[in-house]
């Protein structure tokens, strides 16, 4: 990876400065991707270590997503107002502290709690890192810079499963968190040493903390209801009451946002057709990606009996393609816009997920890897152009907010995808005759592989419908001329 590549046509002094900025942003994207992907490989191991259920262990992922949803736009706005460098460097330090705490956790509840703290650090890195790169680079090279940032994230994705699997098999799962410490400390040092402060000179503004809390509450209540629904039905007072509370929280959130001087969601941005369609495309595509990423390790370990190391090598297939293709897609988006690229990319993902939904109980390794390669190719073609469209379609002083909204949308889609897949998968197991005790004991799923695979296939077919919606939103997003460079 050569971070200097996007700066080749600029004067040498500016090239060097932008290369250093991009390199530091890439470090931040790398550590977030590394941690996220390594943890996926560890989910079956954590379930066994803490003797807990799928319903509980999914909160190791969900708490991170929900806290990101509630904080990423806020810290993006705070970075816009008070200094992106300050919040970016602080994000690294929080990420390091929380990773250390996760590594020494003794219960599932502790690791869930510390993952919440880790989410705050991840939000500060994600929102402010991409905003720093977007503001620093000229409009003509923003897409390529975003492509390199995306590539760095997926280098972390690529490294995470293999490194995580190796660490789990050799020295234990705790080291998937401890490995973050030297990288995070290095990232904080580089941010403080290399970056200049970047903020917008705007006076008399406030940060929308009520909006952040209400958005997080809306999603949390809805996901909790979805988790309980397979066990007690939607008519149960707990489920129906929680859904009503979620709807009320959503209504209150909209009410607060429309009256806020500095809303967490700038509804005015949704008047921009390109921005809106790109956001919806991102939401639907991340919901399906997260659903499959959540269930796939259990299929590989509990049905096919792969070790964590073997799982890691299989799961990296799509990330390997992304690392190679993402910069090219970003370069193409600078020249031809996002509509065609995002449409093609999301359509390829639909095809790959269809084959994932057709996997048998005795699938060969190549039958698994081939659709993962297709999904990786589609995501690489889709993601960089989509991010460039989102950040390039808004005013300069809204870039941090748009970056936060980008991450929030992806995480909301991801959280909904995990919750929906767990709900559908649990329904499938229950309909096939599994008791609640069996359903909540993933260690027993391997004893009934036919039931597992049938439910897994059905779940993936259903969630693949959301990727089809992403294709449609990519088609209607509008031509490149709608991008508003400020």
Indicate where each model-derived feature is located.
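Small-residue (Gly/Pro/Ala) motifs that create kinks and tight helix-helix packing interfaces
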Residues: 43, 156-168, 222, 297, ...
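C-terminal membrane-cytosol helix-exit motif in multi-pass small-molecule transporters
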Residues: 181-200, 216-228, 245-260, 470-480
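Flexible interhelical linker loops that connect adjacent transmembrane helices
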Residues: 12, 188-216, 258-273, 334, ...
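Intrinsic disorder in cytosolic terminal tails and internal cytosolic loops
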Residues: 1-17, 201, 444-447, 477-486
């Amino acid at each position: 990876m050569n971070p200097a590549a996007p700066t080749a046509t600029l004067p040498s002094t500016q090239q060097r400065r932008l290369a250093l900025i991009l390199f530091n942003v890439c470090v931040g994207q790398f550590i977030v991707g590394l941690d996220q992907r390594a943890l996926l490989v560890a989910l079956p191991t954590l379930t066994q270590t803490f003797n807990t259920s799928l319903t509980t262990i999914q909160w190791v992922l969900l708490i991170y997503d929900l806290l990101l949803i509630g904080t990423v736009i806020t810290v993006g706005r705070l970075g816009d107002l008070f200094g992106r460098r300050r919040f970016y460097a602080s994000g690294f330090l929080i990420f390091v502290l929380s990773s250390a705490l996760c590594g020494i956790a003794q219960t599932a509840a502790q690791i869930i709690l510390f993952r919440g703290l880790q989410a705050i650090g991840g939000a500060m890195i994600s929102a402010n890192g991409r905003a720093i790169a977007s503001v620093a680079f000229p409009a003509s090279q923003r897409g390529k810079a975003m492509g390199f940032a995306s590539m760095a994230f997926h280098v972390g994705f690529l490294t995470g499963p293999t490194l995580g699997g190796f660490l789990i098999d050799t020295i234990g799962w705790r080291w998937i968190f401890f490995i973050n410490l030297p990288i995070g400390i290095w990232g904080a040092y580089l941010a403080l040493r290399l970056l200049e402060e970047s903020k917008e000179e705007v006076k008399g503004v406030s940060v929308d903390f009520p909006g952040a809390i209400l958005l997080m509450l809306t999603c949390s209540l809805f996901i909790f209801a979805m988790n309980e629904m397979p066990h007690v039905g939607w008519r149960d007072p707990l489920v129906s009451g929680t859904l009503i509370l979620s709807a009320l929280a959503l209504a209150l959130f909209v009410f607060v946002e429309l009256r806020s001087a500095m809303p967490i969601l700038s509804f005015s941005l949704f008047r921009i057709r390109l921005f809106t369609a790109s956001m919806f495309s991102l939401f639907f595509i991340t919901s399906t990606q997260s659903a499959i990423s959540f269930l796939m390790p259990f299929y590989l370990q509990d049905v096919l009996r792969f070790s964590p190391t073997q799982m890691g090598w299989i799961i990296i297939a799509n990330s390997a393609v992304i690392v190679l293709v993402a910069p090219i897609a970003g370069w193409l988006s600078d020249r031809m816009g996002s509509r065609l690229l995002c449409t093609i990319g999301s359509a390829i993902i639909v095809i790959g997920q269809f084959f994932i939904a057709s996997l048998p109980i005795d699938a060969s390794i190549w039958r698994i890897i081939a659709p993962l390669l297709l999904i990786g190719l589609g995501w690489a073609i889709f993601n960089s152009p989509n991010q460039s469209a989102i950040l390039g379609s808004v005013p300069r002083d809204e870039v941090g907010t748009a970056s936060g909204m980008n991450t929030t949308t992806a995480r909301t889609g991801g959280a909904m995808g995990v919750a929906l897949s767990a709900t559908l998968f649990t329904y499938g197991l229950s309909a096939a005759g599994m008791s609640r005790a069996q359903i909540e004991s993933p260690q027993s799923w391997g004893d009934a592989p036919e039931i597992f695979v049938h439910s897994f296939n059905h779940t993936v077919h259903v969630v693949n419908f959301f990727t089809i919606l992403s294709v449609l939103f990519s088609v209607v997003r509008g031509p490149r001329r709608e991008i508003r460079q400020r």
